[in-house]
UniProtKB/Swiss-Prot annotation:
Mg(2+) binds at D49, E156. It comes from Aeropyrum pernix (strain ATCC 700893 / DSM 11879 / JCM 9820 / NBRC 100138 / K1). ATP binds at G43, V44, S45, G46, G47, V48, D49, S50, T151, K180, S202. Its EC number is 6.3.1.5. InterPro entries: NAD/GMP_synthase, NAD_synthase, NH(3)-dep_NAD(+)_synth, Rossmann-like_a/b/a_fold. GO terms for cellular component: cytoplasm. CDD domains: NAD_synthase. Residues 277-286 have a biased composition (Basic residues). Deamido-NAD(+) binds at R131, K164, D171, H262, K263. One of its GO terms (biological process) is NAD biosynthetic process. Belongs to the NAD synthetase family. This is NH(3)-dependent NAD(+) synthetase.
């Protein structure tokens, strides 16, 4: 496939944000009504994704049906994140609670004989933090009769930048249709303060954790590459020429996508047809 045009971030973000807002809020409203649940519960970190998810949920079903949980770990979460999260939940007028997960994390790692130290176990302990937050969200959802609202975006979904059964655990995922760069613009439009809408992204799974530093390229670059591949259907090998981005960066995104395919799939199991070949015939069947 010969690519005779240039793809830029302008192409990615050139969408009807008011139309997108209406479509997502209508989806959230109808889904909740069909489920019979009483509302939505979500984690709010003070970052752009959870801020937009909160704003859309309130827009869709009203502040009285939304519960926000702020779940810092005092060992790794900057105070500014907690302050930003509190500023948001108060401005949207939703029921909320601040739950420090650090004591829970400490109980886990003190009980695990395989644990060595925070530095050597940085990634598994970081993912443990995400899974603890998911457990708390589902506890609240179960107790309050609500659905867990996911906050991950399409960029993170396609490159697997999330914790399996952690921040990906949810009943509804309204933002997996939007790239990070689109999320930022919609967030600002819907009323999220600009300093939060454009705050550098971080899962805060360990001290000093910054998303773009870990990934090795910016979300703007990631979005242009993903948009080229999955929306414009440009082959991976043609994307450097179409975007002007380094081949190494395109290859990095391709590898992230392919290596994380298991995160976007249900658990693997043996083929049922093969197993049924070994079934015994029912008694009396002729």
């Amino acid at each position: 496939m010969a690519v005779n045009y240039k793809v830029s971030l302008d192409d990615v973000v050139d969408i009807d944000y008011n139309g997108v807002r209406q479509a997502i809020t209508q989806f959230l409203r109808k889904y909740l009504e069909a489920s019979g649940a009483s509302g939505y519960v979500l984690g709010v970190s003070g970052g752009v994704d959870s801020s937009l998810a909160l704003a859309l949920a309130v827009d869709a079903v009203g502040s009285g049906r939304v519960t926000a949980l702020i779940m810092p770990d005092r060992e790794v979460t900057p105070e500014r994140d907690v302050e930003d999260a509190l500023r948001l939940v108060r401005s949207f007028g939703v029921e909320h609670a601040v739950i420090d997960i650090s004591p829970i994390v400490m109980v886990y790692i003190s009980a695990l004989p395989i644990f060595e130290d925070e530095e050597k176990d940085r990634v598994p302990v970081g993912n443990l933090r995400a899974r603890i937050r998911a457990n708390i969200l589902y506890y609240y959802a179960n107790k309050l009769g609500k659905l867990v609202l996911g906050t991950g975006d399409r960029s993170e979904y396609l490159i697997g930048y999330f914790t399996k059964y952690g921040d990906a655990a949810c009943d509804v995922a309204p933002l997996t249709v939007l790239y990070k760069s689109q999320v930022r613009r919609l967030a600002e439009l819907i009323g999220v303060p600009r300093d939060i809408a454009y705050k550098p992204s971080s899962p805060r799974l360990w001290k000093g954790h910054e998303a773009e530093a870990e990934l090795g390229l910016s979300y703007n670059e990631i979005d242009v590459i993903l948009y080229s591949r999955f929306d414009l259907k440009i082959p991976w090998e043609e994307i450097p020429r179409a975007t002007g981005l380094e081949r190494a960066k395109v290859e990095r995104v391709r590898l992230l996508h392919e290596a994380s395919s298991h995160k976007r799939s249900p658990p693997a199991s043996p083929d049922l047809g093969e197993i049924k070949k070994h079934y015994k015939q029912h008694a009396g069947k002729k």
